[in-house]
UniProtKB/Swiss-Prot annotation:
Reaction it catalyzes: 3-hydroxyanthranilate + O2 = (2Z,4Z)-2-amino-3-carboxymuconate 6-semialdehyde
GO molecular function, one term: 3-hydroxyanthranilate 3,4-dioxygenase activity
Activity regulation note: Inhibited by Zn(2+), Cu(2+) and Cd(2+).
The protein's annotated pathway: Cofactor biosynthesis; NAD(+) biosynthesis; quinolinate from L-kynurenine: step 3/3
Subunit structure comment from the entry: Homodimer.
Residues given in the record as Fe cation 2 binding sites: C126, C129, C163, C166
Gene symbol of the encoding locus: nbaC
Binding residues annotated for O2, in chain numbering: R48
Positions contributing to substrate binding: E58, R100, E111
PANTHER family: 3-HYDROXYANTHRANILATE 3,4-DIOXYGENASE
Keyword field contains Metal-binding: yes
Protein known as: 3-hydroxyanthranilate 3,4-dioxygenase
């Protein structure tokens, strides 16, 4: 019998074998490549300033530690808590920013591969007025390899970080460092 993705794997062994990739600076690893699903394990601590606009549903299983999703919905910021053992199915196009403040926390995230032409959006919002500061759309193939260059472009360009509504400059990477220290950005 031929199994496209191999025989069943022991998930705990896989986690142990990839533990060095599940903490900063990498923080995540895809379990299988070239499947219809993007199956990723994300480890904490991990903070993000972007909001993901996924055109498809995302499944979260917070199997170790706690995390939360910052949600931007119709100009209002909200928060969805993910406690250890929780599962959550995020609807398509709900802007979300996963935050994993606990070292050693682990979340299994399952997404569908996007058909050609179906783009994911990544957005940054003003910390003063909640206005949209910047958005980029991309054909997403791998969150592990596709996202860092997008973030580097935003963080490296002060002009992209200036809010068109109130003029406030998004702190960029400094916001991540502030949150990691326990400060407000």
């Amino acid at each position: 019998m031929m199994f496209t993705f191999g025989k069943p794997l022991n998930f705990q062994r896989w986690l142990d074998d990839h533990s060095d990739l599940l903490r900063p600076p990498v923080g995540n690893q895809q379990v299988w490549q070239d499947s219809d699903f993007i199956v990723t394990v994300v480890g904490g601590p991990n903070f993000r300033t972007d909001f993901h606009d996924d055109p498809m549903e995302e499944f979260f299983y917070q199997f170790k530690g706690n995390a939360y999703l910052n949600i931007m919905d119709r100009g209002q910021m909200d928060r969805v808590e993910l406690k250890e053992g929780d599962i959550f199915l995020l609807p398509p196009h709900l802007r979300h920013s996963p935050q994993r403040p606990e070292a050693g926390s682990r979340c299994l995230v399952i997404e569908r591969q996007r058909p050609k032409g179906m783009l994911d959006g990544f957005e940054w919002y003003c910390l003063s007025c909640n206005g949209l500061v910047y958005r980029v759309d991309v054909q997403l193939n791998s969150i592990v390899t596709d996202l860092p260059p997008l973030f580097d472009i935003f963080y490296g360009n002060v002009g992209l970080r200036k809010c068109p509504q109130c003029g406030q400059v998004h702190p960029g990477k400094a916001a991540i460092e502030a949150v990691a220290r326990g400060d407000q950005p």
